[in-house]
Structure formats: structure tokens, C-alpha cells
Regions:
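Flexible, solvent-exposed loop/hinge segments and secondary-structure transition points
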Residues: 1-256
Length: 256
């Protein structure tokens, strides 16, 4: 990928992370790409964790990629989400060099964006992705510090029909998710689901876990419901640990 393309992809990702944290198009108006990236750098902390809920340093990935010929300076220039993408793309080769299968070698490293506008964590943001009707969909979901309440959601990349894509991008659709809960009363992960039609009519008793459906998008909604819960489940061990930390009144800005 050419430098200009790389920069644009980076900017798009950062803008979507800012968007799910609550920054509007009006907030971004007049800001240069450098200003937007600087805002991201100042307001977010990027945390890497493995499948065992253990923090991972980006230097660990950098060292492994250097064994494949990547230059230290080249890797240092990458944002953490870019580094993780390269690392995951090279897992098969890294595993082969280590004499292991991908399943044995893969640490299951994933990213959490900690939104800290005033120094303490306000939102936890994670990437979400999975199959819609016509192909992969990508987005982000933001959770408040109770790691239960949805603060925002954005779908930014997909190949669904143009009309559906426009509907998914509308602030009015995203606002439907705000305040919804991913846990039931017993603390079990149930996620948030897109209903068929009016959520109030079909799921009045579980309205905290449902949003209104989109006309003509039943199969897309089914895909969203499946991959959103699966992605939240992947992060649930980490979220559970953080909830316990919050309950013991440890400062929210303190990250293990």
C-alpha cells in the first residue's frame, strides 16, 4: 500500500474511533488530518491483551516481526492497530518458524481503546466484525465504565445494499443503541440484538437488550446479532475482571 493510502486508511480508522466515542462531524470540521490524529493520541490509551486476559506489550510483536525482516523504524511508525493487523497477517509464517501450528502459536491478541478525555477512563471501545448478508461488516462499540451500558456503536465498512448502508450510518440509527445493556439481571452476557421491526412491540420485557430493526434487513440484522455477541464474548473475560476492579473502587484510570 502506498504511503498516501496508508495514511488515509489510518485516518479513516481513527475518525471512526473518535466517532463512536461521541465526536461528531461538526467537532471534526476544520481539523487537519494531523489535528485528528493528535486528538486521538491525546484522548485514547491503546491496550493490548491476549486470550488469557494478560496485557501484551507492542514491543513483543515488534520483536517477532523483526525476525521476518521488518525494520525497527518501520514498525515504530505504525499505530498499534496497524501493527496488530500486520502481526495477525504473519501469524502463519511466525508459527511455522517456531515449529508450531497457528492454533498453538496464536496468543489471541486483541485491542481495547480506552477513551480518557480527562485522564480517567470514560469508555471502553472494541472493534466488532462479522458477516452481514453480502459480506464482512466492520465497526466499533463503546461501553461505559460499568462495561454493561452501550455508549455508542458505528458500522463503517460493509458491502450491504446502498440503502441499508446509508441507514446504518445515520446518527438516528446509532442513537438507538445508546443506553442498551449487554448483561442481563444476573450479570450474564446476552448482548444487544436488532429486532424484527419495532423492538417495543416484540420485546417489551427485554427492551434493554433490543433495538428497532431496519426495514428489509432481516438477514443483515441476524448477522449483526451473531457477530456482536461473539465479539463481546471474546472480550468478556477482560470485561469481567474490569467490572470486579470497579466494584472494589480501584481508580478507573488505572489499567493493569
Amino acid at each position: 500500500m502506498k504511503p498516501a493510502q496508508t495514511q488515509q486508511v489510518r485516518l479513516d480508522i481513527i475518525q471512526n474511533i473518535l466517532s463512536v466515542a461521541g465526536y461528531s462531524a461538526e467537532d471534526m470540521k476544520g481539523k487537519s488530518p494531523a489535528d485528528i490524529i493528535d486528538l486521538y493520541e491525546k484522548k485514547f490509551e491503546v491496550l493490548l491483551i491476549d486470550k488469557n486476559n494478560t496485557p501484551v506489550q507492542r514491543s513483543e510483536m515488534e520483536k517477532e516481526l523483526q525476525t521476518l525482516g521488518y525494520k525497527e523504524a518501520e514498525l515504530a511508525e505504525m499505530k498499534t492497530f496497524e501493527l496488530l493487523e500486520v502481526y495477525n497477517a504473519k501469524l502463519k509464517l511466525l508459527a511455522k518458524r517456531a515449529g508450531e501450528t497457528v492454533e498453538q502459536y496464536d496468543k489471541g491478541i486483541k485491542v481495547v481503546y480506552l477513551y480518557k478525555p480527562e485522564g480517567e477512563i470514560k469508555y471502553y471501545i472494541i472493534p466488532i466484525e462479522g458477516n452481514g448478508l453480502w459480506g464482512m461488516m466492520y465497526g466499533y462499540i463503546a461501553l461505559k465504565t460499568d462495561l454493561n451500558t452501550v455508549a455508542g456503536i458505528r458500522f463503517y465498512k460493509h458491502i450491504e445494499t446502498p440503502g441499508l448502508g446509508a441507514e446504518l450510518a445515520k446518527p438516528s440509527h446509532n442513537e438507538k443503541w445508546i443506553g442498551k445493556k449487554i448483561l442481563d439481571e444476573d450479570g450474564k452476557l446476552v448482548s444487544v440484538k436488532v429486532a424484527k421491526g419495532d423492538a417495543e412491540q416484540s420485546h417489551a420485557q427485554e427492551i434493554e437488550h433490543y433495538v428497532d430493526g431496519i426495514s428489509g434487513a432481516t438477514l443483515t440484522a441476524k448477522g449483526i446479532n451473531e457477530f456482536l455477541k461473539a465479539d463481546l464474548q471474546t472480550y468478556e473475560p477482560y470485561f469481567k475482571t474490569r467490572r470486579q476492579t470497579e466494584e472494589t473502587q480501584q481508580p478507573a484510570g488505572e489499567v493493569e
